[in-house]
Amino acid sequence: YTPAVNLVFALDESLKMMREEGLENIFLRHEKHKLAMSNAVKALNLKLFADERYLSPAVTAIQTGEIDAEEFRKTIKNKFDILLAGGQDHLKGKIFRVGHLGYVNNRDIITVVSAISKTLLDQGKITTKQAGEALEVACTYLEAN
């Protein structure tokens, strides 16, 4: 069979990018994104699914309370073209997940926080002040670390 040469080239480029950034810097970036995302979520009065001691540097799972997470995800996809992962099995409709593993930069985190904030604002779930505070919190963590 013929191997997927494009995937081999993509892997090679990904490994070059990782070598350039350095593993320690990659780990620090993922930790920074975890902190920015989780603290922005708290500023929006949403609840993290995991206990803070066990938050993942790869993904942030967010409980939506009375908001239907599937409808929330759909709104963000339609309005901002951002794909958020949903909950599975008994968590479907109750949580959504924001991935921040791999090639994710600060602008991506700011964009997702902004989209979540704007959607909550449009639904009357938060105030403009809270939306601004969430963005400020995310930016503070991204700049400080």
Regions found by a protein language model. Name each.
Residues Y1-L35:
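Structural signature of PLP-dependent enzymes
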Residues L11-L15, V41, V112, I116:
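Buried hydrophobic packing segments
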Residues M18, V59-A61, R97-G102:
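Short glycine-rich or small-residue beta-strand-to-loop segments that form or flank ligand, phosphate
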Residues N45-F49, I82-G87:
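A short linear hydrophobic-aromatic micro-motif
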Residues E52-Y54, D89-K92:
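A short beta-turn/loop motif at secondary-structure boundaries
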Residues N78-L84, S117-L120:
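A common structural junction motif
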Residues H90, K94-N145:
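PLP-dependent enzyme catalytic core of the Aspartate aminotransferase-like
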